[in-house]
Design a protein with these regions (language model features):
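Structured-RNA-binding interfaces characteristic of tRNA pseudouridine synthases
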Residues: 1-244
């Protein structure tokens, strides 16, 4: 039976995250519902990266097994799906391909704007406070050297493994905005927001670089967080020629 990979993007504002949950509106549930309408049969999708409630994605993937799809599958699915979910591509891969386990890394961006702008309020955090960007860059460099992130995951996580391999951790600054970019092999629930919030505390000099560094060695959860609407999953990276 063919294995299909679906690439999609979505605005996470109205959803309780990516993964299907009971009594909750999720990205997976919407795509599975649209599939049932189009194909007349139900499937269970496997996702690459399980974004949290309110988090957006420029790129994410599902895979599923099915015999024969509608000849205008993407067009018809996009017509059925809500306007805030878009299917971008579909590929047929070998039966052992896996959208979650074969992904090498995921990249997230947390977007912040410093000057009030009503057109950005749903897609970035308004943060008008004075910040020491150099200190925040130091904190981002520290993150790049770490691999144990227990203090930076939500308390109700079911995770047993708190190790993540970092590939990128940096701030990009512009005149009226800044963006934190982080890439790793995997992420814990709420991790990017907790890290970003902690660095903002460093930037405001509410905590020192030394205190920030010590959080990683603590056996308790970090006490800082920020809203989800500024967070984007931007890339899910697979091996070269994976889709060829």
């Amino acid at each position: 039976m063919p294995r299909y990979f679906l690439e999609l993007s979505y605005k996470g504002t109205n959803y309780s995250g990516f993964q299907k949950q009971e009594n909750a509106n999720t990205i997976q549930a919407e795509v599975e519902k649209a599939f049932l309408v189009l194909q007349g049969q139900s499937i269970t999708l496997i996702g690459s990266s399980r974004t949290d409630a309110g988090v957006h994605a420029l790129q994410n993937y599902f895979h599923f097994d099915y015999e024969e799809l509608h000849p205008q599958f993407l067009y018809k699915m996009n017509a059925i799906l809500p306007e805030d979910i878009a299917l971008k591509k579909i590929n047929i891969l070998p039966a052992n391909a896996h959208s979650r386990f074969d992904a090498l890394s995921r990249r997230y961006e947390y977007r912040i704007y410093r000057k009030k702008n009503p057109f950005l309020q749903n897609f970035a955090l308004y943060y008008p406070f004075k910040l020491d960007i150099q200190l925040m860059e130091e904190a981002a460099t520290i993150i790049g050297t770490k691999n144990y992130f227990f203090p930076f995951c939500k308390t109700n996580t079911q995770a047993k493994n708190f190790n993540c391999t970092m590939y990128k951790s940096q701030w990009v600054t512009k005149e009226d905005s800044l963006m934190y970019i982080i890439e790793a092999n995997r992420f814990l629930r709420g991790m990017v927001r907790l890290l970003t919030a902690s660095m903002l505390q460093v930037g405001r000099k509410k905590i020192s670089i030394e205190e920030f560094n010590r959080i990683f060695d603590a056996n308790e959860k970090c006490g800082f967080s920020i809203p989800s609407h500024g967070l984007f999953l931007t890339h899910v990276n697979f091996p070269n020629a994976y889709f060829n």
